[in-house]
Amino acid sequence: MSETIVNCPTCNQDVIWKPESKYRPFCSERCQLIDLGEWANEEKRIAAVENDVMTSDLEGHY
């Protein structure tokens, strides 16, 4: 069975995908924290879908 190798989302270094890889998909704690900081600073976000069906259900129901 061959090893699965992924790229670190922060620095693109190869990371072996296995339970022992403590920071997977990141190569290190440093890269993991950089990514977390980008989310916290709202530099990254999940794109919203315009005219989402659920959005109209939530409007005016606070």
Curated annotation (Swiss-Prot):
Binding-site residues, Zn(2+): C8, C11, C27, C31
SUPFAM superfamilies given in the database record: Glucocorticoid receptor-like (DNA-binding domain)
User: What GO terms are given for molecular function?
Assistant: DNA topoisomerase type II (double strand cut, ATP-hydrolyzing) inhibitor activity; zinc ion binding
Give the record's cofactor note, including how many are bound: Binds 1 zinc ion.
Does the keyword Zinc feature in the UniProt annotation? Answer: yes
Q: What InterPro entries does the annotation carry?
A: DNA_gyrase_inhibitor_YacG, Znf_NHR/GATA
Q: Gene3D superfamilies from the xrefs?
A: Erythroid Transcription Factor GATA-1, subunit A
- State its cofactor: Zn(2+)
Q: Does the keyword Zinc-finger apply?
A: no
What are the entry keywords?
A: Metal-binding, Zinc
Q: Which BP terms in the Gene Ontology apply to this protein? A: regulation of DNA-templated transcription
Query: What is this protein for, i.e. what is its function?
Result: Inhibits all the catalytic activities of DNA gyrase by preventing its interaction with DNA. Acts by binding directly to the C-terminal domain of GyrB, which probably disrupts DNA binding by the gyrase.
Family assignment from sequence similarity: Belongs to the DNA gyrase inhibitor YacG family.
Q: How does it assemble?
A: Interacts with GyrB.
Name of the protein in its database record: DNA gyrase inhibitor YacG
The species this protein belongs to is Actinobacillus pleuropneumoniae serotype 5b (strain L20)
**What gene makes this protein?**
yacG
